[in-house]
Amino acid sequence: FIAGTYGVGKSTLCDKLCRKLNIPAFSAGDLISEINGETYGKNKVVKNKIANQNILISAVEKKLSLYPTFLLAGHFCIFDKSDEVEILPEFIYEEMPIVKIILLETDFDRILRNIKSRDDKSYNLDSIKNIIRLEREQAEKISSQLSIPLHIHKMDFAESDIKQISTIIQGSAT
């Protein structure tokens, strides 16, 4: 499970890892969108997070019937329509066969720039700091509760990211 806040580089990293490791990669948001028809482009607003998590569980089960291993990019926390942080329901992680959690992090100013560039959306600094903090807290909590190894990776936005994460995925890093 490749986790991290908006704008941390999950999709870009997963695309590169997919090619390097020959493992399919999917975005949780894209899997949900394929079924419920909602698009989570620039606004990122989720209408029903419980229903969406149930959709995700079903979509992951379908993908597992096709692929024994794949990368799933997603979140532990999201913003609501008021840009307040919402923690996603914990049952979702219990229902998915997650082998490792790789939490991507970077500086809040980089996240703000990435989101502005990609989505033309501006979040206030406190909201970004809060979601970064809560994303890590939830990753640590889920890792501990479910005994799933957690790897926290500080993004450099360079080839070194691909090399380090590939090593973690392939199991030669602790």
Describe the role of every protein-language-model region.
Residues I2:
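Hydrophobic anchor at the beta1->P-loop junction of P-loop NTPases
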Residues L66-H75:
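Loop/turn-to-beta-strand initiation segments
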Residues H75-R118:
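ATP-dependent NMP and nucleoside kinases share a basic, alpha-helical "lid"
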Residues K121-I162:
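Small-molecule kinase domains that catalyze NTP-dependent phosphoryl transfer to phosphate-bearing small molecules
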